[in-house]
Amino acid sequence: MLDDYEDGYVGTSHYQTFNPQVLRCSKKHKVLHLHGAIDYGFKPFGESNSAWIAPDLIPDLVKYSSYNLASEHSRPQFSANQAGYACQSSSIITGSNKTDKLIAVPFVFYNSEFVNSIIKNPSLLIIGYSFSDFHLNRVIDEVTKLHGLNRRIVIIDSIPDRAITHYVQASC
């Protein structure tokens, strides 16, 4: 178990808020929940996400101290994407139109950190990933281009025949 890690969430109340500066500056191991977590939820009704005059159109996710608290505040929130179509924000990213869902905080920062880590590092540890998300696969594809034969990808998964042959064969 990874005890000493950074995920960018800070605070001591019943929920923590995301601070991208904390994530960026930390020297600890970084845990990026690219598809969310069961202890994420939205702020209690009536609490604002920002100090801006205009309210946020896409609510930030906060991290609750327990799953039970998070589940009380995890109902999907609806807004519109740039094209004007309905977009659902949720504590777990599933289904189609994932790129629309990635603009919620912390996902937008987690994905940015993921891309920057790929650029800087030839090593990648993947745990329990289905390889069915184009936005992540595109970044993983770049590891070989960026790092050539120096790249190391370790995949830990309980399903042995997922779509990893592309990444394994690239080293031959």
Predicted features along the sequence, with ranges:
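Extended, H/D-rich, highly charged conserved domains that either
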Residues: M1-S90, L102
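SIR2/sirtuin-family catalytic core signature
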Residues: Q21, K27, N97-C172
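Gly-rich Lys/Arg/Thr-decorated short loops/hinges at beta-loop-alpha junctions or inter-strand turns
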Residues: S90-S96
